[in-house]
Amino acid sequence: MGLIEICRLIRTGLVCALLFLGCAAGNDYPENIILFIGDGMGVAHITAGKIARGNINLERFSVMGLVTTHSADHLVTESAAAATALATGYKTNNRAISVSVNREPLKTLFEYAKEQGKSVGVVVTSSVTHATPAAFMAHADDRSQQADIAEQIAYSTMDVLIGGGWSYFVPAATPGSKRKDQKNLLAALKSRMPVILTEDKLSASLHADNRKLAALLSSGGLPKAADRDYSLTQLTRSA
């Protein structure tokens, strides 16, 4: 896919959701669409960045816009409802994952992309089942349904999946599992892409000629940047 240039941390807990859309060579359209999501980021944070650093790359964009991410049932949003607004264009209730206020599934950007034969993927510092990335890959009445979200992801048509959260993909009998059943979702992932669970295999996998890859590098969210030997920038650049 070869697409990511750089993703800089705005604050701890940045989630970087990526939508990859390949276009035919020689036209005037972008080769890919890349969506960077800063946890809790808004206009005030951009302004603070300008005050601290002066001109920022964001200002170089020829077109800019605003998206409201408040929820349908509350002025104060949270990750699930906000990500649903970004992933589907619809407002929903707090805690809902890409379902309407009536709990009907809402079509996501990734689903539209797949209909067009495009490749899609996410690279996150959280668990891949966390509310923000989940809104692009799954549908759930409540963000706490991470075991069900993991199952939807495992049987989805995702091409790249990098982050944490392997504990939701292994049977309950496996030490560290957060599932309550004996489903082995890693096996489902392995049936269609290479899967790695440890940092020591990360470098080789990122440099291999893999068109698809699942790297679940932690049982939950990834360690803090200071506590790991790889960066979000490296992960996204290799996606």
What are these regions (language model features)?
Residues 12-22:
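Bacterial N-terminal signal peptides
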Residues 2-13:
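Bacterial N-terminal signal peptides that target proteins for export
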Residues 7, 198-199, 236-239:
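Glycine/proline-rich, flexible active-site/cofactor-binding loop segments
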Residues 212-216, 220-238:
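Soluble metallo-hydrolase cores and metallopeptidase-like ectodomains found primarily
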Residues 27-206, 211, 225, 230:
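N-terminal catalytic scaffold of extracellular/periplasmic and nuclease hydrolases
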